[in-house]
From Swiss-Prot:
Partially overlaps DFN2. Residues 74-97 are annotated as: Disordered. This is Putative uncharacterized protein YDR095C.
Length: 136
């Protein structure tokens, strides 16, 4: 875990900029369902990386003392087209849980996008099918 100082904040912004590319933008749209990703890379590795950065030890300070690293939905192999939530803790539910009880990676990314926009830092994630302005 990185500490919550300004140096690690800047380091993470650089990391996030590298990880979240135009290629990833389509797979993290708010409308994307994990089990509908056919020819695209599942968002789980990216989601886990972002979850680590969202832990209370880091600069976002969104959750209570609980890492979100295991909060993501995973495919339930026994039920086609269904997902089951992984365990989550603390106030993570308040921010990330869907009404159906699961956690969508795109919701965390939406939070990050909103945060980045609030500090005028564009990371090229879009909630529409058109991936506009990816190189900004």
């Amino acid at each position: 875990m990185r500490s919550g100082n300004s140096g690690s904040c800047n380091h993470f912004l650089v990391f996030l900029r590298k990880v979240v590319t135009c290629h990833n933008a389509a797979i993290v749209r708010k409308t994307t369902k994990y089990n509908s990703l056919k020819h695209k890379t599942p968002p789980l590795p990216l989601a886990l990386a972002l979850a680590d950065a969202l832990s209370p030890q880091n600069f976002f300070h969104i959750t209570s003392p609980a890492s979100l690293s295991y909060s993501w939905r995973r495919a339930d192999p026994g039920r086609k087209g269904r997902t089951q939530p992984l365990p989550t803790q603390g106030s993570a539910r308040r921010f990330l849980h869907t009404p159906q009880g699961g956690v969508e990676p795109c919701r965390v990314i939406h939070i990050i996008t909103s945060y980045m926009k609030s500090i005028s830092y564009h990371i090229g994630i879009h909630s529409t099918k058109e991936e506009k302005n990816c190189n900004h």
